[in-house]
């Protein structure tokens, strides 16, 4: 069995965020926020949402620029009402460098 809190979905040398979180504020979306860690102006955030019970995941490998410190992930499948495991990572614009992923915990999607 997979232990979601121990799983790495990204591995690399870019700095992770110092603080990070995710909340579901509207139907079928998660809003990610983060702060801290060194970065280059065009580094991007990567979002991953995993519904372990149904074996379904969705991700965006270049969601928004890291410097914005916030981004909304609209899910393409109906995750409404489901409990999901949430991960955040960062990637350089040229995709050559990544951070280790950070497990942000479980969320119930509105």
Question: What are the residue ranges of the model-derived segments?
Answer:
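Beta-strand-rich modules
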Residues: 73-100
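Extracellular fibronectin type III
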Residues: 2-5, 94-110
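Surface-exposed loop/edge segments in extracytoplasmic proteins
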Residues: 53-62
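An aromatic-rich alpha-helical recognition segment common to small helix-rich domains
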Residues: 32-34, 47, 88
